[in-house]
Design a protein with these regions (language model features):
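Charged, amphipathic alpha-helical stretches
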Residues: 2-30
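Short, aromatic- and cysteine-enriched interfacial helices/patches
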Residues: 3-6, 64, 96-98, 162-164
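Acidic, low-complexity, intrinsically disordered interaction modules
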Residues: 24-153
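A generic alpha-helix propensity feature with a strong bias for hydrophobic helices
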Residues: 113, 163, 170-172
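Terminal short linear interaction segments
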Residues: 150-168
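Long, low-complexity, intrinsically disordered segments
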Residues: 170-180
Length: 180
């Protein structure tokens, strides 16, 4: 899944949360994003900046869902995850045994990820975090290598809770998927 597709399939509440976080906590990133995306649409940034925050978020959602915005989308997701979702990143990296700086950034990514460690780690994350957040993280993490990791791709394919844009499973189904 490409970065713009993550935004296409994520819930409006999650994407609004991402944009709101960036607007309030990462102001320079937000301004640069608006300027870059506006220029890509042949608009002056002031066109977007004059809108209310909610109107800006709606414009951003529409714009980042377009195919040509992948680079910006991936950058936004990385910043949001590293800054706003640090605990999730650290738990994932620790769980699968990837060395990191203690804040969720890893310099050397492995060629393979142990499927059993991955499954146990993701089940733990799903018990603690919103499944959509875990799905966004896994799909974004997959973008860190050209072909991603087979173990992550297979796990996403096997568990509907990790599939962005898929209907949420009923509670009984979610319990069955966790038991597998």
């Amino acid at each position: 899944m490409k970065a713009h597709q993550i935004f296409q399939h994520a819930s409006p509440a999650l994407t609004r949360g991402i944009f709101h976080y960036l607007r309030t906590e990462q102001k320079e990133v937000y301004r640069t994003t608006v300027s870059t995306l506006a220029a890509g649409r042949k608009l002056r940034p002031v066109f977007v900046q004059k809108k209310t925050p909610e109107e800006q978020y709606a414009w951003l959602q529409k714009t980042v869902s377009m195919k040509g915005s992948d680079t910006v989308c991936e950058h936004l997701l990385q910043i949001w995850l590293l800054k706003a979702q640090r605990d999730l990143l650290v738990k994932f990296l620790d769980g699968v045994g990837i060395a990191h700086d203690g804040e969720g950034a890893a310099d050397d990514l492995p060629d393979t990820i142990d499927a059993d460690k991955l499954k146990a780690t993701v089940q733990s994350l799903l018990a603690e975090y919103d499944p959509e957040l875990v799905a966004v993280y896994l799909n974004t993490f997959q973008l860190q290598r050209l072909e991603g990791w087979d173990a992550i791709r297979d796990l996403i394919a096997a568990d509907p809770r990790l599939q962005l844009g898929a209907p949420a499973p009923a509670k009984a189904e979610a319990g069955e998927a966790a038991a597998e």
